[in-house]
Structures are given as structure tokens and as C-alpha cells.
């Protein structure tokens, strides 16, 4: 069995087409984590539904489209914002070679999207205003990038994937260095 639930309220089941956390149940689903009752309780509901940690949507035909990991979702001014959707829109820009979007602290909205971009060789510099103009109409206003950092290279994991974890750590260190005291 497969269903979608609200990320912020797992008791609320979602209709087809809505983004939410995918949950599965059946004889092929584990009963819990070995010797870890706390992790088991967090991942499994009392009636056996396993929370996958994937944000996805199920269409009317039953096809599942995975959008993001729950842990990567941003909460911006009360809206669930999925960095992958923003990244896809930025990749449509003809001068962008690589992009990684993370959430940064925002005193008013909680979090705001920040894009780290590596431009293609020979591309003209890209400004935040130009990127926002490009994204207008491609993503929602609540998803709009609020900060941009151009880089010659983006950090990667040992297997070559872009590393959001490294960018979050850099931002954490930057915020700590800027903090008073």
C-alpha cells in the first residue's frame, strides 16, 4: 500500500497530486530498526505505515514522482519549499552549469532559499536581480531565491554528487563568525 501524508501532520492523508511524505505499508516493510525503538517509533506509525522520508506526489494514475527528501525541504514564511524545484528552474538558465539551493536563516520568513551557482565557461556574471527576473513565472513567489553566490566550483561528495551538507556547514560557520560576542 502507498499513501501520501502532510509532512507537518502525518495523520492528514493527501489527495492525488499534492506534495507530501510518501508512506508505505505491507508484508515487505520492516517492523522496525534493530535495537532502536526511538528510530522505529519515528519511522513507523502504530498501524504499520513506514514514513520513507521522501517528498513526492502521486498522480491520478498512481504514478509516484519523488520531489525531495523531507530533510531538504525548507519552511519559508509558512510555505513548504522544495530546493529541487528551484534548482530545476535555475538549470533552465542557459548560462548555468551547476546549482545547489539550500535554506539560510531569515529573521522574518524563518528560512530563505540561497542558490550557489557555477556558470558555464565564458558566461557573463549573473546577478541576483537577473536570476530573479529569469525565475519570475517559473516558480512561486514563496520559492524565489533571496541570495545568490557564484562559485568557480561547487563542493562535491566523494562520489561526485553536489554536497548540500558542505554548503550548510559553510553557512553555519559564516553565521557563527558574524554573530556578536
Language-model features: where?
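Conserved beta-loop-beta connector loops within the AMP-binding
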Residues: 1-23, 42, 60-61, 124-128, ...
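Generic structural signal for residues in well-ordered beta-strands
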Residues: 2, 99, 148-150
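Active-site glycine/GP-rich loop and adjacent strand/helix microenvironment
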Residues: 14-16, 32-35
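AMP-binding/adenylate-forming catalytic core of the ANL superfamily
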Residues: 26-32, 39, 55-143, 152-155, ...
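Active-site-adjacent loop/helix segments that line or gate small-molecule/cofactor pockets in enzymes
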Residues: 42-43, 181
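Acidic/polar alpha-helix N-cap and adjacent early helical turns
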Residues: 169-181
Amino acid at each position: 500500500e502507498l499513501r501520501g501524508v502532510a509532512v507537518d501532520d502525518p495523520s492528514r492523508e493527501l489527495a492525488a497530486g499534492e506534495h507530501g511524505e510518501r508512506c508505505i505499508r505491507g508484508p515487505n516493510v520492516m517492523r522496525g530498526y534493530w535495537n532502536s525503538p526511538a528510530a522505529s517509533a519515528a519511522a513507523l506509525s502504530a498501524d504499520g505505515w513506514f514514513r520513507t522520508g521522501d517528498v513526492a506526489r502521486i498522480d491520478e494514475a498512481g504514478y509516484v514522482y519523488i520531489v525531495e527528501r523531507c530533510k531538504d525541504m525548507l519552511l519559508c514564511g509558512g510555505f513548504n519549499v522544495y530546493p529541487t524545484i528551484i534548482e530545476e528552474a535555475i538549470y533552465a538558465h542557459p548560462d548555468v552549469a551547476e546549482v545547489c539551493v539550500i535554506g539560510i536563516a531569515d529573521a522574518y520568513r524563518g528560512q530563505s532559499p540561497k542558490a550557489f551557482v557555477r556558470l558555464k565557461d565564458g558566461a557573463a556574471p549573473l546577478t541576483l536581480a537577473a536570476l530573479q527576473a529569469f525565475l519570475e513565472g517559473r516558480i512561486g513567489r514563496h520559492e524565489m531565491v533571496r541570495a545568490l553566490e557564484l562559485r568557480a566550483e561547487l563542493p562535491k561528495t566523494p562520489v561526485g554528487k553536489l554536497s548540500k551538507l558542505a554548503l550548510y556547514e559553510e553557512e553555519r560557520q559564516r553565521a557563527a563568525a558574524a554573530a556578536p560576542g
